[in-house]
């Protein structure tokens, strides 16, 4: 996805840009690695701002790849240093985006491979199912686990998510740090367009 660049940051429901291309959005808990993953996929460490502070992404960020596909970095859910009112605001914009965006082809739900699904992730999965939103699950920070532990976590998450009518297979894993799994995920994204 070389040539992908930041084009817009949206903080309210009336400002969504219309690129006329398919969109793939990335969601997950705060600090799961959404921005780092976008940087790895686009091979540009400066595309998406990253931070060790949870809740740093407080708007929906759009990255356009040569007019072919848009990658969308959604604010993290869960812990944030933002005020409750600000958090409610950007989560409302995110919900509106997910429910109304016709260009959205796939949501990629990121789960920290060291932690697995937390209750808030399971709640989000239920919400996606209730609203008929197609999604994939990708485990992040795979470089932090041994091959055996990673395989066990993939199986665990697969079992936890089983029965999802809108879950698209397979569950994948990536490491933004080492680059493992990035090419495979980019290929999977290209299949959405």
Swiss-Prot record:
Family to which this protein belongs: Belongs to the TRAFAC class TrmE-Era-EngA-EngB-Septin-like GTPase superfamily. EngB GTPase family.
Task of the protein: Necessary for normal cell division and for the maintenance of normal septation.
Residue ranges occupied by any EngB-type G domain in the UniProt entry: 20-193
Cofactor(s), by name: Mg(2+)
Binding site for Mg(2+): 35, 57
Name of the protein this chain belongs to: Probable GTP-binding protein EngB
InterPro entries linked: G_ENGB_dom, GTP-bd, GTP-bd_ribosome_bio_YsxC, P-loop_NTPase
Pfam family, one: MMR_HSR1
GO BP term (any one): division septum assembly
This protein's UniProt keywords: Cell cycle, Cell division, GTP-binding, Magnesium, Metal-binding, Nucleotide-binding, Septation
Highest taxon listed in the record's lineage: Bacteria
Residues that bind GTP: 28-35, 55-59, 73-76, 140-143, 171-176
GO MF terms, alphabetically ordered: GTP binding; metal ion binding
